[in-house]
Amino acid sequence: DLLNKPKEIKEKILIGRVEKRLKELSLMDQTFIKDSNLSIEELIKQNISLLGENIKIRRFERFVLGEGLNKRSDDFANEVAQIINAN
């Protein structure tokens, strides 16, 4: 998708892509799951000013969208047939 673009535009696109990826990987730059308008860094700063105490992140858990969900492979027609045959 970058083949026919001028050199200056290619550089800007690549810089944008790298920055976007770094934002996804860095905890402090990620969006807060309960309020997508806040980054984790902004949330921590808000809570520091609210509490008047310093806050340090000691540990965190990483969640991936859809992780841990198992797709069910139920066959509804087969289920109904089994129920009918059982009676």
Curated annotation (Swiss-Prot):
Entries under PANTHER family matching the protein: ELONGATION FACTOR TS, POLYPROTEIN OF EF-TS, CHLOROPLASTIC
One Gene Ontology term, aspect cellular component: mitochondrion
Name of the featured protein: Elongation factor Ts, chloroplastic
Listed InterPro entries: EF-Ts_dimer_sf (IPR036402), Transl_elong_EFTs/EF1B (IPR001816), Transl_elong_EFTs/EF1B_dimer (IPR014039)
SUPFAM superfamilies: Elongation factor Ts (EF-Ts), dimerisation domain
Transmembrane segments: none
Function: Associates with the EF-Tu.GDP complex and induces the exchange of GDP to GTP. It remains bound to the aminoacyl-tRNA.EF-Tu.GTP complex up to the GTP hydrolysis stage on the ribosome.
Localization of this protein: Plastid, Chloroplast
Gene3D superfamilies according to UniProt: 1.10.286.20, Elongation factor Ts, dimerisation domain
